[in-house]
C-alpha cells in the first residue's frame, strides 16, 4: 500500500477547494474565474507529477494503492489505485477540464455555482477512474451525475430542461442495473462479501450468472458510451448544453462508459465477454454506419457533431469486442483521441455561436472571410475527425481495423465483413464533416448580425483551440506516447481470454 495518499488528494482537492468559491465576493467574477482556473492547473500539475515520479509503466499491476476502512458497519473501504488503463483517462480529464474552465469565461449568470459544479464533476470523474472498489466506483459514478444534471438544466438553450431530464432518466435507469450488478457480484459466493477489484478479478461464477451480471453492467455502460439504441439522450443534450459543458460531456463523460466496459465487463467477467463480443462487434459496426448516415441530415451544428461522436464510439466498441491486443489498444487510443477531437469541435461550435447567434447550418454560409482563424481551426479538426493520416484519429481507427482483422477468435469471412462495414463508415465520415464546413464557411453570407464587424477568435479562444490541437497532432505523429501507458495492462487483460 502506498505510504502517502496521492490519489485521495487528487480526488478530493477539486471539490474541497471548489467549495471555497462561495466565500469569494459576489461581484468578483474575474477573481473567481482565475481561482477556478488555478485549481484546475494545480490539480493537473499534481496529477502529472504523481504519475511521472511514482508510477512504473512496465508494471501491469495496480499502483499507488490506498486502502482505508471507511464505514465500519458495512465493512466498506475507500480503495483507490491506478494502472495503465486508468492513467490516460485521468490525465485527459485534467487537461479537458482545465480548458473547459477557460472556455467557460463568458458565463456570467450564477458563475460561482457554475464553476463549483465543474470542479465537483472533476472530482467525481477522477474518483470513477481511480476506484478499486466496486461500491466506491458506483458512488463516484452517481455523484458525478448531480453536477452534470445541474449544468445541463441551468445553462444552455431553450429546451435545456427537457434535455437534462432526458439525460437523468436514461442515466439513472442505467444506474439501477449497475447497482444490481455491483450488489450481486459483491454478495455472491464467499462467506465474507467483498467488492475489491483484485479479489473479484480472480473469482469465477456459473456461466448463466456471469451472463446476467454482464447484461446488467452492459446496459449501464451502454447508456453512457452510448451504444444504440440507448443513444437518443446524447444529441438532445449536446444540442442544448453550454459549450463548455459539451466539452466535458464529449471529452470525458462518454469515455467513462468505455472505461467501465473494459474495467468491469472485460476484467471481471471474461467468460461472458467471450460470448457477447461478437454481438458487440456487430452493434459497433452498425453504430458507425447508422450515426455517420444520420449526421448529414442534422441541421443543428452541435447535433451533427454529437452524431459524429456516436459514430466514433462504434470503433471503441469494436476494439473492445475484438479480443486482441491491437484492437483493445486501438480502443484505448480512440478514447484519448476522441476526447481531444470531440472537446475541440464543440468548443469551436460554441465560439461560432457566440459570434453569430446561429446554430442551424442552413442559415449560415460565407463565414470563412470574416472569421479566418475559426475557419482554419475547424477545418483542421474536421480533418482529425475524419481520420486524416498524421492526426490521432487515423492511428486509433487503423489499430482497431487491424485488431479485428488479426483477431484469433473469429473466422475469416465475418472479419472481412466487419472490416468492410467499418470501411463504409470511414467513407461516410468525410461526407458529413466536409458538408458541415461547406455549409458554414463557403458560398454567400446568409445571416445578418446586428453589428457586421464582429471579431474573429481572440487570444483565449486561440489558446484553447491550439492546446486541444497539439495533442491530436502529437498522438498522430507519435502514438507510442499514449500506447506505452496501457500496453502492459492490455496484454494482462487479453491473456485472460486465451489462458483462463
Swiss-Prot record:
It is found in: Plastid, Chloroplast thylakoid membrane. It catalyses: a plastoquinone + NADH + (n+1) H(+)(in) = a plastoquinol + NAD(+) + n H(+)(out); a plastoquinone + NADPH + (n+1) H(+)(in) = a plastoquinol + NADP(+) + n H(+)(out). It comes from the Eukaryota. The chain crosses the membrane at residues 4-24, 37-57, 87-107, 111-131, 134-154, 167-187, 208-228, 242-262, 272-292, 305-325, 330-350, 386-406, 416-436, 462-482. Keywords: Chloroplast, Membrane, NAD, NADP, Plastid, Plastoquinone, Quinone, Thylakoid, Translocase, Transmembrane, Transmembrane helix. HAMAP family: NDH1_NuoM (MF_00491). PANTHER family: NAD(P)H-QUINONE OXIDOREDUCTASE CHAIN 4, CHLOROPLASTIC, NADH-UBIQUINONE OXIDOREDUCTASE CHAIN 4. This is NAD(P)H-quinone oxidoreductase chain 4, chloroplastic. The lineage of its organism: Eukaryota, Viridiplantae, Streptophyta, Embryophyta, Tracheophyta.
Amino acid at each position: 500500500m502506498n505510504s502517502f495518499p496521492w490519489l485521495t488528494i487528487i480526488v478530493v482537492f477539486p471539490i474541497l477547494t471548489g467549495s471555497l468559491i462561495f466565500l469569494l465576493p459576489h461581484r468578483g467574477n474575474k477573481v473567481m474565474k482565475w481561482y477556478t482556473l488555478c485549481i484546475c492547473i494545480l490539480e493537473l500539475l499534481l496529477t502529472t507529477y504523481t504519475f511521472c515520479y511514482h508510477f512504473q509503466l512496465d508494471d501491469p499491476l495496480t499502483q499507488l494503492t490506498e486502502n482505508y476502512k471507511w464505514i465500519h458497519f458495512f465493512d466498506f473501504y475507500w480503495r483507490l489505485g491506478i494502472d495503465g488503463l486508468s492513467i490516460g483517462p485521468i490525465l485527459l480529464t485534467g487537461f479537458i477540464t482545465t480548458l473547459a474552465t477557460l472556455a467557460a469565461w463568458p458565463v456570467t449568470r450564477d458563475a460561482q455555482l457554475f464553476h463549483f459544479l465543474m470542479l465537483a464533476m472533476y472530482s467525481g470523474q477522477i474518483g470513477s477512474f481511480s476506484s478499486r472498489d466496486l461500491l466506491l466506483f458506483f458512488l463516484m459514478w452517481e455523484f458525478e451525475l448531480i453536477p452534470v444534471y445541474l449544468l445541463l438544466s441551468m445553462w444552455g438553450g431553450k429546451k435545456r430542461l427537457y434535455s437534462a431530464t432526458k439525460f437523468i432518466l436514461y442515466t439513472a435507469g442505467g444506474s439501477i442495473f449497475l447497482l444490481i450488478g455491483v450488489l450481486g457480484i459483491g454478495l455472491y459466493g464467499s462467506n465474507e462479501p467483498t467488492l475489491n477489484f483484485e479479489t473479484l478479478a480472480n473469482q469465477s461464477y456459473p456461466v448463466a450468472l456471469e451472463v446476467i451480471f454482464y447484461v446488467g453492467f452492459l446496459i449501464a455502460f451502454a447508456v453512457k458510451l452510448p451504444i444504440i439504441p440507448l443513444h437518443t439522450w446524447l444529441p438532445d443534450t449536446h444540442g442544448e448544453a453550454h459549450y463548455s459543458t459539451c466539452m466535458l460531456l464529449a471529452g470525458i463523460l462518454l469515455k467513462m462508459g468505455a472505461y467501465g466496459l473494459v474495467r468491469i465487463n472485460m476484467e471481471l467477467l471474461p467468460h461472458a465477454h467471450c460470448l457477447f463480443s461478437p454481438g458487440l462487434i456487430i452493434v459497433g459496426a452498425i453504430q458507425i454506419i447508422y450515426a455517420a448516415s444520420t449526421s448529414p441530415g442534422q441541421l443543428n451544428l452541435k447535433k451533427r457533431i454529437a452524431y459524429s461522436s456516436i459514430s466514433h464510439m462504434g470503433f471503441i466498441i469494436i476494439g473492445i469486442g475484438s479480443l486482441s491486443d491491437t484492437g483493445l489498444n486501438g480502443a484505448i487510443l480512440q478514447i484519448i483521441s476522441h476526447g481531444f477531437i470531440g472537446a475541440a469541435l464543440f468548443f469551436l461550435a460554441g465560439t461560432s455561436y457566440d459570434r453569430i447567434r446561429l446554430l442551424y447550418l442552413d442559415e449560415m454560409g460565407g463565414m470563412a472571410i470574416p472569421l479566418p482563424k475559426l475557419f482554419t481551426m475547424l477545418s483542421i479538426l474536421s480533418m482529425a475527425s475524419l481520420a486524416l493520416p498524421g492526426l490521432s484519429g487515423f492511428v486509433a481507427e487503423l489499430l482497431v481495423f487491424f485488431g479485428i482483422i488479426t483477431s484469433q477468435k473469429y473466422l475469416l469471412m465475418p472479419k472481412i465483413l466487419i472490416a468492410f462495414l467499418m470501411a463504409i463508415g470511414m467513407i461516410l465520415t468525410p461526407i458529413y464533416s466536409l458538408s458541415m464546413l461547406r455549409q458554414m464557411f463557403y458560398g454567400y453570407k446568409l445571416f445578418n448580425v446586428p453589428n457586421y464587424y464582429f471579431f474573429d477568435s481572440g487570444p483565449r479562444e486561440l489558446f484553447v483551440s491550439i492546446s486541444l490541437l497539439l495533442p491530436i497532432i502529437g498522438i498522430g505523429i507519435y502514438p507510442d506516447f499514449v500506447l506505452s501507458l496501457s500496453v502492459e495492462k492490455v496484454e494482462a487483460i487479453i491473456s485472460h481470454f486465451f489462458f483462463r
